Swiss-Prot record:
Contains a conserved N-terminal oligomerization domain (NTD) that is involved in oligomerization and is essential for proper subapical membrane localization. This is Partitioning defective 3 homolog. It is found in: Cytoplasm; Endomembrane system; Cell junction; Cell junction, Tight junction. It comes from Mus musculus. GO terms for molecular function: phosphatidylinositol-3,4,5-trisphosphate binding; phosphatidylinositol-3-phosphate binding; phosphatidylinositol-4,5-bisphosphate binding. The lineage of its organism: Eukaryota, Metazoa, Chordata, Craniata, Vertebrata. Acetylated. Deacetylated by SIRT2, thereby inhibiting Schwann cell peripheral myelination. Residues 931-1333 are annotated as: Interaction with FRMD4A. GO terms for biological process: apical constriction; bicellular tight junction assembly; cell division; cell-cell adhesion; centrosome localization; establishment of epithelial cell polarity; establishment or maintenance of cell polarity; microtubule cytoskeleton organization. Residues 712-932, 712-936 are annotated as: Interaction with PRKCI and PRKCZ.
Length: 1333
């Protein structure tokens, strides 16, 4: 450790080891080194009275050095020496013992009076709070010259005459040279105050030297942490930080250290001129900014520039760089800028305004004078009505100065406005023993550093609760320890933990105590251990020192001379904005940064653009982060427009440029000062219910009341000097862009001088804490706010480390989260949505996806609200995005089947179109995806479980169990179903009435609905539920529970009935067209006459029975011959009710062929497999039958059966895993009796028993094989099987027709599943009984 001891301008560096030495020992070492520095022998007499710290405070002789000073600190010695050297080079031995020819005694010999005043034993300087508050640092004279010791001490005070200090008359008593002395009061009999301040005290008697500095009751060191010196030390530190000290010695090096003869001794009276301005209500045309000294003190308002053609320029009232120090009765010095502006506005109400101005030529001297005088300028000296003496003193016996008044010749008045106490009663008539000088401007080792331990700050007691994320801050120490220890500082605040949640601890705070344990002498490791010893959920108490920095106002252009009309003045008193239109107010906030340095201002900003020309409209506050500095300040609001930040204007800049300016200014200037200055424009509330929290109420605001220190309301004209608001062509151009008529941010068209864009016309009713959040400070994203507001996504308020997300209260006022370009930084990083699937844009993407269930929003809502709804997924929700192979489908179905029962009730989904489809196929069915399908329980809409045929047929003619059954509509026509028919008729009648009623109401909706029905007609066949009325009513109750309002329920019900009525018409017509097309295709493929020869009579009978076209005479003859052979009467031809023009047949066939092209990747052997449909021939067959049926044929049939079993194992596993329907109805009984009377041949029976077709047995009765099986899975399977069937049919068509009668077994024509299906589905009028299958 080492310190620097300053003996005047001579500095001595003294090594101190570990700092465990006393101050007394330090003085001894410093004196020894000083003697060597000035080349004096060891007998040279030097007495050090005390040591003062460079930052203030007196060091006690018994203090341990490391306790009162830090490493490399600078100490000032107050000392006396035997022979002041007057020109000798202190570093050269050749000047040893030499003196300047102008000896000190010669001055005394030529003058009858001395330049020093006698020293009195009772004139010890007394340190009092008044002296300290008066910014009067203490200094002690050096009167140890031996040539003066013989002077008499009885010299009368009246005989004193002072002389100006000069090189001929050096004044070595000063601790630091080269600074002007304080203008203090002198003797009452002295008329010239310039001479009063030059009194010096005579040296004391050598016999009293030992008694000069003693510790007694009247003497005590003043601790640096004493509250009385807080204010004085802060001001002193500001001066020290702004003062540059010349460390080089004047030439010659050993010359006397005073140069006051080069500096004129002037006062503020000589510099100030009085300007009288009559108040005619017009603007002065000046732009003013705060004028601050280097130490941070505000010295007034500086005239930055004059408006061309303005009043100030025309009447020559002001000039550029003039400094206004006083307006009327208000002193503008040492005032914050907002306070000065408030005083300015108050002065505008007077008829005549008196400006006290320091001209630009004297500005430099005025700034230097301000270093010596804190407030010596009399407040009422140039007041127009100051015609009386205003004696200001705190003691009756305090001497009064009689200054001159050169301007208006007012009576003299006391100059020193600071209080001063007399030293004693009997010495009150004498001049002060030591005139006060300027504070010693000794630079500290860390000038401007907030971490200087000697700078007294604020004591804070902070309690932190340790959570799972720890205390949340890190500590550091100095590199060079002092006495084995070093002060502990908070290094930074972590983004998570107790510190940032509490918000009070700040980076740079010095830790004094932890849980009552003093950290003095503790190392950093010990402090860390002490902090870590805190238990989880425990509380740690921290005592910290924080250095308070004075706010340095940035230079801002303003026009405070803008005159207000009486109406506007009244409006200001009533807390209304100052702009003439009365729609907006300009607020300036001094927002202290959050105690955690990383939190920043804590706002999210947005850049708005014009909807018409896309011009940038400015930067606005989008949201205020809960827990940030702006949120704690509580005055900034959402939709406030940022005009300037830390004096940097954001107007007239592009949004991106303004964002960069904002980010740069807040990250550098805000962190440096610990405070961010914001100028915002806010639309005024109509009812004043949203008054700024920091603004005082209107009735309680007197004229003299100053606004809050952190808030000021300023007219727009005050900030017209800011870029974009300047009264210039450039400014008008910028405002013309801002004031463009924009629907986003409508404003009233007003003069450009008083207009600033406000973002929204709606009232900002949300408090600052109800806002969006983010985990970064002052983050921004240039979003574009939509005109239609949408509700925010609901989010849970989080108590995490950063902050919480709160939804907007009013959805009308909330901006649209799905707006173009809208995503905050917090959403990009943390995705803090409560449920992303509930967001509108997510739903939109889902509903438009080719691979997702139709209309997720509707289905999810109904499923979630349906009581007892099963949660197991079936079908496409199994995870099959694209079920292009039977293997993936079979595996998924098998897994679900093994896991448990499949739910019975499911909403009818749309088909997944994940397989490869060309555009024509997609165009045919894509309209079915416009709206969600009606739920299976709604109004008796048919489900796959209850009517396999009706719901499973698609435009591509699926090969499924439904192919084995006759259509339900045909069965209903042949069978007759009065109950179902009556219900259908009632539905149709009701739907007809509803159509007339709702035709105009649902005109727009019908467009989408018609498209849906058209597409569904090609894909599905619809029918009526076979459920009873009870199940139908239960379905209605369930769907009603899923809607919240009666209106929605009625609308949905009417819509469903209308859709059902239309879909029934489509179903009946399409069923007829489909059956006709299928029969025609079968007839063209095989031919009834060919099948008669080898396929069995029942097959041919079925072919004729289902044929819907007129028969030729040849066909009729063959039919009669066939019936004659089997000895069965032939029934009449079936009715023509099923006849229909095959209008859609060609289109359906074309779509099938196109779809099959994408799936022709099966094994070649599968395509060549053949099937045996051989039957046992009855004995009544003609003798011409060929004898090709032999043993070899039997062997070949068995081989084919084995191949079929192996090739269709996948289909077997799939269908075998499905539950089978065990019950039978009338149709199954009739089918059994038919099979008993007419048993098929061996080949046909083997084909039916083939594992490939074994699944057909379980669904022959009109019911799906497994109850509750999902329709989508069945349709997927049907499509895959149907593709294979169609490929084989096409291959069969390509075979050349063979002439003649073929045998029962054919190798060249592979049978297809449709043959078995048609054989099994054929009906006959035998015995007058209808055929059921």
């Amino acid at each position: 450790m080492k310190v620097t001891v300053c003996f005047g301008r001579t500095r001595v560096v003294v090594p101190c080891g570990d700092g465990r030495m006393k101050v007394f020992s330090l003085i001894q070492q410093a004196v020894t080194r000083y003697r060597k520095a000035v080349a004096k022998d060891p007998n040279y007499w030097i007495q050090v009275h005390r040591l003062e710290h460079g930052d203030g405070g007196i060091l006690d002789l018994d203090d341990i050095l490391c306790d009162v000073a830090d490493d490399k600190d600078r100490l000032v010695a107050v000392f006396d020496e035997q022979d002041p050297h007057h020109g000798g080079d202190g570093t050269s031995a050749s000047f040893t013992g030499t003196q300047s020819p102008e000896i000190f005694g010669s001055e005394l010999g030529t003058n009858n009076v001395s330049a020093f005043q006698p020293y009195q034993a009772t004139s010890e300087i007394e340190v009092t709070p008044s002296v300290l508050r008066a910014n009067m640092p203490l200094h002690v004279r050096r009167s140890s010259d031996p040539a003066l010791t013989g002077l008499s001490t009885s010299v009368s005070d009246n005989n004193f005459s002072s002389e100006e200090p000069s090189r001929k008359n050096p004044t070595r008593w000063s601790t630091t040279a080269g600074f002007l002395k304080q203008n203090t009061a002198g003797s009452p009999k002295t008329c010239d105050r310039k001479k009063d301040e030059n009194y010096r005290s005579l040296p004391r008697d050598p016999s009293s030297w030992s008694n000069q500095f003693q510790r007694d009751n009247a003497r005590s060191s003043l601790s640096a942490s004493h509250p009385m010196v807080d204010r004085w030390l802060e001001k002193q530190e500001q001066d020290e930080e702004g003062t540059e000290e010349d460390s080089s010695r004047v030439e010659p090096v050993g010359h006397a250290d005073t140069g006051l003869e080069n500096m004129p001794n002037f006062s503020l009276d000589d510099m100030v001129k009085l300007v009288q301005v009559p108040n005619d209500g017009g603007p002065l045309g000046i732009h003013v900014v705060p004028f601050s000294a280097r130490g941070g003190r505000t010295l007034g308002l500086l005239v930055k520039r004059l408006e061309k053609g303005g009043k100030a320029e025309q009447e020559n009232l002001f000039h550029e760089n003039d400094c206004i120090v006083r307006i009327n009765d208000g002193d503008l010095r040492n005032r914050r800028f907002e306070q000065a502006q408030h005083m300015f506005r108050q002065a505008m109400r007077a008829r005549v305004i008196w400006f006290h101005v320091v001209p630009a030529a004297n500005k430099e001297q005025y700034e230097q004078l301000s270093q010596r005088e804190k407030n010596n300028y009399s407040p009422g000296r140039f007041s127009p009505d100051s015609h009386c003496v205003a004696n200001r003193s705190v003691a009756n016996n305090a001497p009064q100065a009689l200054p001159r008044a050169p301007r208006l010749s007012q009576p003299p008045e006391q100059l020193d406005a600071h209080p001063r106490l007399p030293h004693s009663a009997h010495a009150s008539t004498k001049p002060p023993a030591a005139p006060a000088l300027a504070p010693p401007s000794v630079l500290s080792t860390n000038v401007g550093s907030v971490y200087n331990t000697k700078k007294v700050g604020k004591r804070l007691n902070i309690q932190l609760k340790k959570g799972t994320e720890g205390l949340g801050f890190s500590i550091t120490s100095r590199d060079v320890t002092i006495g084995g220890s070093a002060p502990i500082y908070v290094k930074n605040i972590l983004p998570r933990g107790a510190a940032i949640q509490d918000g009070r601890l700040k980076a740079g705070d010095r830790l004094i105590e932890v849980n009552g344990v003093d950290l003095a002498g503790k190392s950093q490791e010990e402090v860390v251990s002490l902090l870590r010893s805190t238990k989880m959920e425990g509380t740690v108490s921290l005592l910290v020192f924080r250095q308070e920095e004075a706010f340095h106002p940035r230079e801002m252009n303003a026009e405070p001379s803008q005159m207000q009309t009486p109406k506007e003045t009244k409006a200001e008193d009533e807390d209304v904005v100052l702009t003439p239109d009365g729609t907006r107010e300009f607020l300036t906030f001094e927002v202290p940064l959050n105690d955690s340095g990383s939190a920043g201002l804590g706002v999210s900003v947005k850049g708005n653009r014009s909807k018409e020309n896309h011009a940038d409209l400015g930067i606005f506050v989008k949201s205020i982060i809960n827990g940030g500095a702006a949120s704690k300040d509580g005055r900034l609001r959402v939709n406030d427009q940022l005009i300037a930040v830390n004096g940097e204007s954001l107007l007239g800049k592009a949004n991106q440029e303004a964002m960069e300016t904002l980010r740069r200014s807040m990250s550098t200037e805000g962190n440096k000062r610990g405070m961010i200055q914001l100028i915002v424009a806010r639309r005024i509330s109509r009812c004043n219910e949203l008054r700024s929290p920091g603004s005082p109420a209107a009735p309680e605001l007197p004229i003299e009341t100053e606004l809050d220190d952190r808030e000021r309301r300023i007219s727009h004209s005050l900030y017209s000097g800011i870029e974009g608001l300047d009264e210039s062509p450039t400014r008008n151009a910028a405002l013309s862009r801002i004031m463009g008529k924009c629907q986003l941010s409508p404003t009233v068209n007003m003069p450009h001088d008083d207009t600033v864009m406000i973002e929204d016309d709606r009232l900002p009713v949300l408090p600052p804490h109800l806002s969006d959040q983010s985990s970064s400070s002052s983050h921004d994203d240039v979003g574009f706010i939509m005109t239609e507001a949408g509700t925010w996504a609901k989010a849970t308020i989080s108590d995490s480390a950063d902050c919480s997300l709160s939804p907007d209260v009013d959805p009308v006022l909330a901006f649209q989260r799905e707006g173009f370009g809208r995503q905050s930084m917090s959403e990009k990083r943390t995705k803090q949505f409560s449920d992303a699937s509930q967001l509108d844009f997510v739903k939109t993407r889902k509903s438009k996806s080719m691979d997702l269930v139709a209309d997720e929003t509707k289905l999810n809502t109904v499923d979630d609200q349906r009581a007892g709804s099963p949660s197991r997924d079936v079908g496409p929700s199994l995870g099959l995005k694209k079920s292009s192979s039977l293997e993936s489908l079979q595996t998924a179905v098998a897994e679900v089947t093994l896991n448990g029962n499949i739910p019975f009730h499911r909403p009818r989904p749309r088909i997944i179109r994940g397989r490869g489809c060309n555009e024509s196929f997609r165009a045919a069915i894509d309209k079915s995806y416009d709206k969600p399908m009606v739920d299976d329980d709604d109004e008796g809409m048919e489900t796959l479980e209850e009517d396999t045929e009706e719901s499973s047929r698609s435009g591509r003619e699926s090969v499924s169990t439904s192919s084995d059954q006759p259509s339900y509509s045909l069965e209903r026509q042949m069978n007759g179903d009065p109950e179902k028919r009556d219900k259908t008729e009632r539905k149709k009648d009701k739907a007809g009435k509803d159509k007339k009623k709702d035709r105009e109401k649902e005109k727009d909706k019908l467009k989408a609905k018609k498209g849906m029905l058209k597409g569904l007609g090609d894909m599905f066949r619809f029918g009526k539920h076979r459920k009873d009325d009870k199940m139908e009513k239960m379905g209605r109750i369930k769907i009603q529970d899923s809607f919240t309002s009666e209106e929605d329920r009625v609308r949905m019900k009417e819509e469903q009935e209308r859709i059902q009525a239309k879909t029934r018409e489509f179903r009946e017509r399409q069923a007829r067209e489909r059956d006709y097309a299928e029969i025609q295709d079968f007839h063209r493929t095989f031919g009834c006459d060919d099948e008669l020869l080898y396929g069995g009579m029942s097959s041919y009978e079925g072919c004729l029975a289902l044929n819907a076209r007129p028969q030729s005479p040849r066909e009729g003859h063959l039919m009669d011959t066939l019936y004659a052979q089997v000895k069965k009467p032939r029934s009449s031809k079936p009715g023509d009710s099923n006849r229909s023009t095959p209008s859609n047949h060609d289109r359906i066939q074309r779509l099938r062929q196109e779809f099959q092209q994408a799936k022709q990747d099966e094994d070649v052997e599968d395509r060549r497999r053949t099937y045996s449909f051989e039957q046992s021939w009855s004995s009544s067959r003609p003798a011409s039958q060929s004898g090709r049926h032999s043993v070899s044929v039997e062997v070949q049939v068995q081989r084919q059966r084995q191949e079929e079993r192996e090739s269709f194992q996948q289909a077997q596993r799939q269908y075998s895993s499905l539950p089978r329907q065990s019950r039978k109805n009338a149709s199954s009984i009739s089918q059994d009796s038919w099979e008993q009377n007419y048993a098929p041949g061996e080949g046909f029976q083997s084909a039916k028993e083939n594992p490939r077709y074994s699944s057909y047995q379980g669904s022959r009765n009109g019911y799906l094989g497994g109850h509750g099986f999902n329709a989508r899975v069945m349709l997927e399977t049907q499509e895959l099987l149907r593709q294979e069937q169609r490929r084989k049919e096409q291959q069969l068509k390509k075979q050349p027709p063979a002439d003649g009668v073929r045998g029962p077994f054919r190798q060249d024509v592979p049978p297809s599943p449709s043959q078995v299906a048609r054989l099994n589905r054929l009906q006959t009028p035998e015995k007058g009984r209808p055929f059921y299958s």
